[in-house]
């Protein structure tokens, strides 16, 4: 059970890190598409 919790925390952290890293790129791409 502890392994599942640790895996879930690691997955959430990795997804949050990739989201915060890709968010500026996605926002700039959306701005360029709407322009």
Swiss-Prot record:
Chief location of this protein within or outside the cell: virion
Membrane association type: Single-pass membrane protein
Keywords per UniProt: Late protein, Membrane, Transmembrane, Transmembrane helix, Viral envelope protein, Viral penetration into host cytoplasm, Virion, Virus entry into host cell
Transmembrane segments: 2-22
Upregulation: Expressed in the intermediate phase of the viral replicative cycle.
Maturation and modification: Unglycosylated because produced in viral factories instead of the classic ER -Golgi route.
GO CC aspect terms: membrane; viral envelope; virion membrane
Subcellular compartments: Virion membrane
Assembly and interaction partners: Component of the entry fusion complex (EFC) composed of OPG053, OPG076, OPG086, OPG094, OPG095, OPG099, OPG107, OPG143, OPG104, OPG147 and OPG155. Except for OPG095 and OPG053, each of the EFC proteins is required for assembly or stability of the complex.
Homology family: Belongs to the orthopoxvirus OPG076 family.
Function: Component of the entry fusion complex (EFC), which consists of 11 proteins. During cell infection, this complex mediates entry of the virion core into the host cytoplasm by a two-step mechanism consisting of lipid mixing of the viral and cellular membranes and subsequent pore formation.
The protein's name in its UniProt record: Entry-fusion complex protein OPG076
UniProt lineage: Viruses, Varidnaviria, Bamfordvirae, Nucleocytoviricota, Pokkesviricetes
Name of the coding gene: OPG076
């Amino acid at each position: 059970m502890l392994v599942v919790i640790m895996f879930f925390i690691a997955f959430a952290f990795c997804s949050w890190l990739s989201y915060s890293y890709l968010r500026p790129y996605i926002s700039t791409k959306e701005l360029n598409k709407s322009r």
